Amino acid sequence: MKREEINIRDPFVLTRNGQYYLYGTRGATCWGPADGFDVYVSRDLENWDGPFECFYNDGTFWADRNYWAPEVHEYHGKLYMLASFKREDLCRGTAILTADDPLGPFVPHSDGRVTPSNWECLDGTLYVSPDDKPYLVFAHEWVQVGDGEICAMPLSSDLSRAIGEPKLLFHASEAEWARLVHHRSSGRDGYVTDGPSMWRTAGGTLLCLWASFSDEAVSYTHLRAHETRRHL
């Protein structure tokens, strides 16, 4: 299939062995009950094979809705999927799954969420420091805190659990371009933080790319960079 025929949100591409593996939120089940993730495979980023189901909830997984933003990272020779999940009686959070192949099957690796159990969190990504220490960088949702946050939290060497408390990197309102938005369900206003991704420049500066709303767009705007410092 062609790239424009793929119906996903939150795309993430893993490159491995000369191929591109595209993961994302299923468009058809984005806002309601969900049971898995798919992967598409390409050699040119235009023509794709798939979808191939790479994770499926057989009824034993803890979450049943809002399967969002899967990212797959290779770390110490293994593949790890970081994704956001939700259940009605539980806060949204990032859980970690693992597989031996980019096509899966991915299976639960962390014991539920690795983000704080009483925080509404999403869009967790993996950052590995120059001294090989893994961190989860994630968004603390604006629907809970008002002024959305990007936080970082150290992970165990096997990526199965958090080994420290979250550290605030910045608030959404610190960006001059961020626009206040209204949440219809709660009736509150706030600043959104979504989709963090860490990037180090050639000069060694560590940047966080992230998304929110701005006056430049009627709705969602493109990623912007926020300088965090040389290390977390």
Task: Kindly label every feature range from the protein language model.
Residues 1-15, 29-32, 46-74, 105-128, ...:
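Surface loop/turn signatures of beta-propeller and other carbohydrate-active proteins
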